[in-house]
């Protein structure tokens, strides 16, 4: 199996109450690819500038990530984001954004990227997401977005959502997109647009999965619902990229099981997404995930499974 992801490949400068870093490797496609690489062959697509050196390429290649579709633009500068977090790590404050070569990005997939079994469209302009989707005949596709595109390009975003199988956004964004305060109603509204699955990311509180059975209408009776909490951690240093790491674990696992999208696999994918996100936040940027071992992932997955299950024992009656 093979997975293509299209999105930002960047440098980040981040300050939290627990430390700070200057110009560390980041971007949605990077965090996604590192997480997905534990399960499948992953190929990120995106532009970088001359400032993206061999050190950054080698970090990705050391994880088996195929870098042939990362386009280095001569004379250009890579996407750069500077932000900070206060003690509420659920809220990122943007201090500076420099699009660099990403401003003129026109995605053109290689033959290998087009042939991927799974496609993930990270948070980029919706019209670009549609351009990529038209180039790739992947059997399973997903999309992430943000409040900016809901505000300024809602029609284009809804058209892009209609062309994918799974929408992955945070709970505030899905409510904003649909105008529904209730999360279940909001997910149902999204599924009426086309996707058969909706994942609502909820930060430190975990994630919720809504799915419709194949061949059924998007009504309440046909919905499946599953939710997991965030993995409990005593030390959280930097949440940047956690949502992308979640998506990488989720889609990477599904591609690794040959795209078998039954309900059981979707729920296991939620578990692996949750686990990868939990490792991501333990240190800054890619520091933790880039040296993570598969055994650590499986151990934490099993710990998460144990802490979220209970026996169905009838309650005593008075």
Language-model features, listed with the residues they occupy:
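Short beta-strand scaffold segments in enzyme catalytic cores
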Residues: 34, 81-84, 206-210
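Short, conserved phosphate/pyrophosphate- and ester-handling motifs at nucleotide-, phospho-/glycolipid
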Residues: 36, 170, 243
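Conserved phosphate-binding/catalytic region of the ribokinase-like
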Residues: 184-318
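Active-site metal-binding loops of divalent metal-dependent hydrolases
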Residues: 7-9, 245
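Histidine-anchored nucleotide/phosphate-binding helix
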Residues: 27-37
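Extreme N-terminal starter segment of soluble prokaryotic enzymes
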Residues: 1-4
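Conserved beta-alpha-beta core of the PfkB/ribokinase-like small-molecule kinase fold
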Residues: 118-188, 205-206, 212
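Conserved N-terminal subdomain of the carbohydrate kinase-like
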Residues: 11-23, 38-120, 134-139, 298-318
